[in-house]
Amino acid sequence: MAVKGFRPTTPTRREMTMCTFEEITTSTPEKSLLVSLKKSGGRNANGKITVRHIGGGAKRKYRVIDFKRNKDNISAKVVSIEYDPNRTAFIALVVYADGEKRYMIAPVGLKVGDTVVSGPESDIKVGNCLPIRNIPVGTVIHNIELAPGKGAQLVRSAGNSAQLMAKEGDYSQVRLPSGEVRYIRVECRATIGVVSNQTNEIVNIGKAGRKRHMGVRPTVRGSVMNPNDHPHGGGEGRSPIGHPSPRTPWGKPALGYKTRKNKKYSDRFIVKRRHDK
Protein backbone atom coordinates (compact mmCIF):
# COMPACT_ATOMS: atom_id res chain seq x y z
CA MET A 1 0.00 0.00 0.00
CA ALA A 2 1.26 3.48 -0.89
CA VAL A 3 1.78 6.59 1.23
CA LYS A 4 0.51 9.94 -0.03
CA GLY A 5 1.68 13.47 0.73
CA PHE A 6 -0.22 16.76 0.82
CA ARG A 7 0.07 20.20 -0.71
CA PRO A 8 1.96 22.52 1.68
CA THR A 9 -1.01 24.75 2.56
CA THR A 10 0.52 25.02 6.07
CA PRO A 11 4.04 24.21 7.33
CA THR A 12 2.83 20.98 8.96
CA ARG A 13 0.98 19.79 5.85
CA ARG A 14 4.30 19.96 4.00
CA GLU A 15 5.72 17.07 6.07
CA MET A 16 2.49 15.17 6.75
CA THR A 17 1.90 11.81 5.06
CA MET A 18 -0.94 9.30 5.19
CA CYS A 19 -1.75 5.78 4.00
CA THR A 20 -3.83 5.63 0.84
CA PHE A 21 -5.98 2.79 2.28
CA GLU A 22 -6.26 1.08 -1.12
CA GLU A 23 -6.89 -2.29 0.56
CA ILE A 24 -9.93 -1.04 2.49
CA THR A 25 -13.15 -2.23 0.83
CA THR A 26 -15.83 -0.76 3.14
CA SER A 27 -16.22 2.05 5.66
CA THR A 28 -19.16 0.49 7.52
CA PRO A 29 -18.28 -2.03 10.27
CA GLU A 30 -20.34 -5.08 11.23
CA LYS A 31 -22.73 -3.86 13.97
CA SER A 32 -22.98 -7.22 15.73
CA LEU A 33 -19.21 -7.15 16.39
CA LEU A 34 -19.04 -3.63 17.87
CA VAL A 35 -18.68 -2.79 21.57
CA SER A 36 -18.88 0.67 23.15
CA LEU A 37 -15.70 2.17 24.58
CA LYS A 38 -15.63 4.63 27.47
CA LYS A 39 -12.68 7.00 27.69
CA SER A 40 -10.72 7.06 30.95
CA GLY A 41 -8.45 10.01 30.22
CA GLY A 42 -5.67 8.01 31.85
CA ARG A 43 -7.42 8.19 35.26
CA ASN A 44 -8.19 5.35 37.65
CA ALA A 45 -11.36 4.89 39.76
CA ASN A 46 -10.14 7.57 42.19
CA GLY A 47 -9.71 10.13 39.43
CA LYS A 48 -5.91 10.13 39.68
CA ILE A 49 -3.71 10.06 36.57
CA THR A 50 -2.15 6.61 36.36
CA VAL A 51 -1.08 6.85 32.69
CA ARG A 52 0.20 10.17 31.38
CA HIS A 53 -0.37 11.66 27.92
CA ILE A 54 -3.87 10.20 27.44
CA GLY A 55 -7.04 12.22 26.87
CA GLY A 56 -9.50 13.47 24.26
CA GLY A 57 -9.52 11.97 20.80
CA ALA A 58 -12.24 10.94 18.39
CA LYS A 59 -15.00 8.60 19.54
CA ARG A 60 -14.51 5.01 18.52
CA LYS A 61 -16.18 1.64 18.85
CA TYR A 62 -14.21 -1.48 19.70
CA ARG A 63 -14.19 -4.21 17.06
CA VAL A 64 -14.32 -7.67 18.67
CA ILE A 65 -11.41 -9.56 17.10
CA ASP A 66 -11.16 -13.35 17.01
CA PHE A 67 -7.64 -13.97 18.33
CA LYS A 68 -8.34 -17.61 19.25
CA ARG A 69 -9.26 -18.82 15.73
CA ASN A 70 -10.75 -21.94 17.34
CA LYS A 71 -13.48 -22.71 14.79
CA ASP A 72 -11.68 -25.68 13.29
CA ASN A 73 -12.14 -27.26 9.86
CA ILE A 74 -14.89 -24.81 8.85
CA SER A 75 -13.97 -22.60 5.91
CA ALA A 76 -14.57 -18.86 6.17
CA LYS A 77 -14.92 -16.45 3.26
CA VAL A 78 -13.41 -12.95 3.44
CA VAL A 79 -16.25 -10.46 2.96
CA SER A 80 -14.40 -7.18 3.51
CA ILE A 81 -11.10 -5.59 4.58
CA GLU A 82 -11.74 -2.76 7.07
CA TYR A 83 -9.97 0.00 8.97
CA ASP A 84 -9.80 -0.43 12.75
CA PRO A 85 -9.24 2.74 14.83
CA ASN A 86 -8.07 0.65 17.79
CA ARG A 87 -4.99 -0.86 16.10
CA THR A 88 -2.47 -0.16 13.35
CA ALA A 89 -3.28 -3.31 11.34
CA PHE A 90 -6.31 -3.70 9.09
CA ILE A 91 -8.98 -6.26 9.95
CA ALA A 92 -10.90 -8.71 7.79
CA LEU A 93 -14.56 -9.63 8.21
CA VAL A 94 -15.00 -13.35 7.54
CA VAL A 95 -18.21 -15.36 7.27
CA TYR A 96 -18.05 -19.06 8.14
CA ALA A 97 -19.93 -21.75 6.24
CA ASP A 98 -22.44 -21.97 9.11
CA GLY A 99 -23.18 -18.23 8.86
CA GLU A 100 -21.19 -16.94 11.85
CA LYS A 101 -19.33 -13.65 11.33
CA ARG A 102 -15.98 -12.83 12.95
CA TYR A 103 -13.22 -10.26 12.62
CA MET A 104 -9.58 -11.33 12.25
CA ILE A 105 -6.30 -9.46 11.77
CA ALA A 106 -5.80 -9.12 8.01
CA PRO A 107 -2.44 -10.37 6.69
CA VAL A 108 -0.70 -9.00 3.60
CA GLY A 109 -2.18 -10.48 0.42
CA LEU A 110 -5.57 -11.43 1.86
CA LYS A 111 -8.34 -10.22 -0.47
CA VAL A 112 -12.13 -10.22 -0.58
CA GLY A 113 -13.35 -13.59 -1.78
CA ASP A 114 -10.43 -15.56 -0.33
CA THR A 115 -11.08 -18.52 1.96
CA VAL A 116 -9.33 -19.08 5.31
CA VAL A 117 -9.41 -22.15 7.56
CA SER A 118 -8.28 -22.95 11.11
CA GLY A 119 -7.19 -26.29 12.49
CA PRO A 120 -4.30 -28.79 12.51
CA GLU A 121 -5.02 -30.02 8.96
CA SER A 122 -5.12 -26.54 7.38
CA ASP A 123 -2.90 -25.75 4.39
CA ILE A 124 0.17 -23.54 4.78
CA LYS A 125 -1.55 -20.57 3.16
CA VAL A 126 -1.77 -16.86 4.06
CA GLY A 127 -4.50 -16.28 6.64
CA ASN A 128 -4.79 -19.90 7.78
CA CYS A 129 -4.30 -20.61 11.50
CA LEU A 130 -2.86 -23.85 12.84
CA PRO A 131 -0.75 -25.20 15.73
CA ILE A 132 2.99 -24.50 15.47
CA ARG A 133 3.53 -28.29 15.51
CA ASN A 134 2.03 -28.43 11.98
CA ILE A 135 3.89 -25.39 10.57
CA PRO A 136 7.16 -26.01 8.63
CA VAL A 137 10.40 -24.53 10.00
CA GLY A 138 11.25 -21.22 8.30
CA THR A 139 7.63 -20.16 7.78
CA VAL A 140 6.75 -16.49 8.39
CA ILE A 141 3.96 -16.22 10.98
CA HIS A 142 2.03 -13.71 13.11
CA ASN A 143 -0.76 -13.70 15.73
CA ILE A 144 1.11 -16.14 17.98
CA GLU A 145 -0.30 -17.60 21.19
CA LEU A 146 1.78 -17.73 24.38
CA ALA A 147 -0.45 -20.34 26.02
CA PRO A 148 -2.53 -22.94 24.13
CA GLY A 149 -6.13 -21.76 23.72
CA LYS A 150 -5.54 -18.34 25.29
CA GLY A 151 -5.62 -16.41 22.03
CA ALA A 152 -2.90 -14.61 20.08
CA GLN A 153 -0.75 -12.20 22.08
CA LEU A 154 2.42 -11.75 20.01
CA VAL A 155 3.09 -10.12 16.61
CA ARG A 156 -0.24 -8.37 15.99
CA SER A 157 0.69 -4.82 14.90
CA ALA A 158 1.00 -3.44 11.36
CA GLY A 159 3.74 -4.86 9.15
CA ASN A 160 5.08 -7.27 11.77
CA SER A 161 6.01 -10.91 11.36
CA ALA A 162 7.94 -13.62 13.19
CA GLN A 163 9.82 -16.64 11.85
CA LEU A 164 9.68 -20.23 13.06
CA MET A 165 13.33 -21.18 13.60
CA ALA A 166 13.23 -24.70 15.04
CA LYS A 167 11.07 -27.35 16.73
CA GLU A 168 12.28 -29.73 19.42
CA GLY A 169 9.99 -31.82 21.61
CA ASP A 170 7.17 -29.79 23.18
CA TYR A 171 8.70 -26.41 22.29
CA SER A 172 9.54 -24.40 19.20
CA GLN A 173 11.96 -21.52 18.74
CA VAL A 174 10.42 -18.39 17.24
CA ARG A 175 12.34 -15.25 16.25
CA LEU A 176 10.19 -12.23 17.11
CA PRO A 177 10.27 -8.84 15.30
CA SER A 178 12.51 -7.38 18.05
CA GLY A 179 15.17 -10.01 17.31
CA GLU A 180 14.42 -11.98 20.48
CA VAL A 181 14.33 -15.76 20.07
CA ARG A 182 11.83 -17.40 22.37
CA TYR A 183 10.57 -20.87 23.27
CA ILE A 184 6.85 -21.31 22.51
CA ARG A 185 4.86 -24.51 23.01
CA VAL A 186 4.10 -26.36 19.78
CA GLU A 187 0.41 -26.60 20.77
CA CYS A 188 0.12 -22.80 20.52
CA ARG A 189 -1.48 -21.50 17.35
CA ALA A 190 -0.12 -19.01 14.85
CA THR A 191 -1.39 -17.51 11.60
CA ILE A 192 0.56 -17.73 8.33
CA GLY A 193 1.81 -14.50 6.74
CA VAL A 194 2.75 -10.91 7.56
CA VAL A 195 0.41 -8.43 9.26
CA SER A 196 -1.18 -5.92 6.85
CA ASN A 197 -0.52 -2.15 6.51
CA GLN A 198 3.26 -2.48 6.12
CA THR A 199 3.73 1.20 5.26
CA ASN A 200 2.42 2.32 8.66
CA GLU A 201 5.95 2.77 10.05
CA ILE A 202 6.92 5.38 7.44
CA VAL A 203 3.83 7.57 7.93
CA ASN A 204 4.70 11.04 9.27
CA ILE A 205 2.05 12.33 11.70
CA GLY A 206 3.13 15.88 10.79
CA LYS A 207 1.22 17.94 13.33
CA ALA A 208 0.15 17.92 16.96
CA GLY A 209 -3.56 18.15 16.14
CA ARG A 210 -3.49 14.81 14.40
CA LYS A 211 -2.01 13.21 17.52
CA ARG A 212 -4.78 14.82 19.61
CA HIS A 213 -7.38 13.16 17.37
CA MET A 214 -5.72 9.87 18.34
CA GLY A 215 -6.21 10.64 22.02
CA VAL A 216 -2.56 11.49 22.76
CA ARG A 217 -1.81 14.56 24.90
CA PRO A 218 1.48 16.53 24.89
CA THR A 219 4.67 15.28 26.56
CA VAL A 220 6.21 18.12 28.60
CA ARG A 221 9.96 18.16 29.32
CA GLY A 222 10.88 17.83 32.97
CA SER A 223 13.42 20.69 32.73
CA VAL A 224 10.64 23.23 32.13
CA MET A 225 8.58 22.09 35.14
CA ASN A 226 8.70 23.27 38.73
CA PRO A 227 10.91 21.34 41.18
CA ASN A 228 7.85 19.89 42.94
CA ASP A 229 6.66 18.39 39.62
CA HIS A 230 9.87 16.80 38.31
CA PRO A 231 13.43 16.08 39.52
CA HIS A 232 14.76 18.10 36.55
CA GLY A 233 12.57 21.13 37.32
CA GLY A 234 13.40 24.51 38.82
CA GLY A 235 16.35 26.85 38.43
CA GLU A 236 16.71 30.14 36.61
CA GLY A 237 16.39 29.86 32.84
CA ARG A 238 17.94 26.83 31.17
CA SER A 239 19.48 25.13 34.17
CA PRO A 240 21.22 21.74 34.35
CA ILE A 241 19.14 18.88 35.70
CA GLY A 242 21.07 18.80 38.98
CA HIS A 243 21.67 15.02 38.94
CA PRO A 244 24.53 12.80 37.78
CA SER A 245 22.11 11.12 35.34
CA PRO A 246 18.58 11.80 34.07
CA ARG A 247 15.62 10.83 36.25
CA THR A 248 12.00 9.86 35.64
CA PRO A 249 9.22 12.05 37.10
CA TRP A 250 9.24 9.65 40.09
CA GLY A 251 12.97 10.00 40.74
CA LYS A 252 14.12 6.68 39.30
CA PRO A 253 17.06 6.48 36.86
CA ALA A 254 16.07 7.01 33.22
CA LEU A 255 17.82 6.20 29.92
CA GLY A 256 19.21 2.68 30.00
CA TYR A 257 17.93 1.62 33.42
CA LYS A 258 16.61 -1.95 33.21
CA THR A 259 13.00 -2.12 34.38
CA ARG A 260 12.42 -5.85 33.79
CA LYS A 261 12.27 -8.00 36.94
CA ASN A 262 15.41 -10.07 37.59
CA LYS A 263 13.58 -13.28 38.49
CA LYS A 264 10.69 -13.45 36.07
CA TYR A 265 9.05 -16.80 35.32
CA SER A 266 9.25 -16.28 31.55
CA ASP A 267 13.05 -15.76 31.59
CA ARG A 268 13.49 -19.51 31.08
CA PHE A 269 11.70 -19.27 27.71
CA ILE A 270 13.99 -16.58 26.25
CA VAL A 271 16.74 -18.22 24.19
CA LYS A 272 18.32 -15.00 22.88
CA ARG A 273 17.55 -11.49 24.08
CA ARG A 274 16.82 -8.74 21.60
CA HIS A 275 19.92 -6.74 22.62
CA ASP A 276 22.37 -9.65 22.26
CA LYS A 277 24.63 -9.44 19.23
Curated annotation (Swiss-Prot):
One of its GO terms (cellular component) is large ribosomal subunit. HAMAP family: Ribosomal_uL2_B (MF_01320_B). Keywords: Ribonucleoprotein, Ribosomal protein, RNA-binding, rRNA-binding. One of the primary rRNA binding proteins. Required for association of the 30S and 50S subunits to form the 70S ribosome, for tRNA binding and peptide bond formation. It has been suggested to have peptidyltransferase activity; this is somewhat controversial. Makes several contacts with the 16S rRNA in the 70S ribosome. Part of the 50S ribosomal subunit. Forms a bridge to the 30S subunit in the 70S ribosome. The keyword rRNA-binding applies. The gene is rplB. This is Large ribosomal subunit protein uL2. GO terms for biological process: cytoplasmic translation. SUPFAM superfamilies: Nucleic acid-binding proteins, Translation proteins SH3-like domain. GO terms for molecular function: rRNA binding; structural constituent of ribosome; transferase activity. NCBIfam families: rplB_bact. Residues 219-277 are annotated as: Disordered. Belongs to the universal ribosomal protein uL2 family.
